[in-house]
Amino acid sequence: MNVNFFVTCIGDALKSRMARDSVLLLEKLGCRVNFPEKQGCCGQPAINSGYIKEAIPGMKNLIAALEDNDDPIISPAGSCTYAVKSYPTYLADEPEWASRAAKVAARMQDLTSFIVNKLGVVDVGASLQGRAVYHPSCSLARKLGVKDEPLTLLKNVRGLELLTFAEQDTCCGFGGTFSVKMAEISGEMVKEKVAHLMEVRPEYLIGADVSCLLNISGRLQREGQKVKVMHIAEVLMSR
């Protein structure tokens, strides 16, 4: 199957291993991965800050970059996936662009959802020894409704003991620009998140949204906690 890969800004600038492992995983599962070279930021930071009008040129650029074919567009970040899926609403005053946005949005899929629901794969042959917790990001679980797919894949990782912890579904406090605008509240939220997950003494924290992982990882480091933080793509490529 041919697919397009939407790398995301964080994947491009900060977490290249996550992006690399996402592509390698797709290729391992038989996909031919195309990288639209003109893709850019989805505009989420501006959108979350209320600068919808200012974000529209970037939205149009991304739409145009992803129109070269009709193949699925795979994203390793729920927040970015949701942002693109919301484009038709933001472009409602421009019918032609709204229509183009809707076609692109319909092709956007989260990495784990694509693997489980489209490829029909629940065991990718991964192996990782240790105790782990999974953080379900708000964008992935609440906005996109992708809840079971990441857990299904993780439960089939050999050697991995998947633990649950108190208030597991609670927001980590990142929320894009929320962590900047409401820094004190955000700080308390991630502090509480870390307190709960550390009660079960995991060796790994796994997530499917890099922004959340960066936020929680920062708190873990400040507390001196020896927990390795991994994107689910990195876990699924572990052997």
Swiss-Prot record:
Any one Gene Ontology molecular-function term assigned to this protein's record: L-lactate dehydrogenase activity
Pfam families cross-referenced by the UniProt entry: CCG (PF02754)
Gene Ontology CC annotations of this record: cytosol
Coiled coil: none
Similarity-based family: Belongs to the LutA/YkgE family.
Further remark: The E.coli ykgEFG operon is a clear homolog of the B.subtilis lutABC operon, however it is not able of restoring L-lactate utilization to the B.subtilis mutant for lutABC operon. Thus, ykgEFG operon may contribute to lactate catabolism in E.coli, but under conditions other than those tested, or alternatively, the ykgEFG operon may be responsible for the catabolism of a metabolite other than (but perhaps related to) lactate in E.coli.
Annotated protein name in UniProt: Uncharacterized protein YkgE
Gene: ykgE
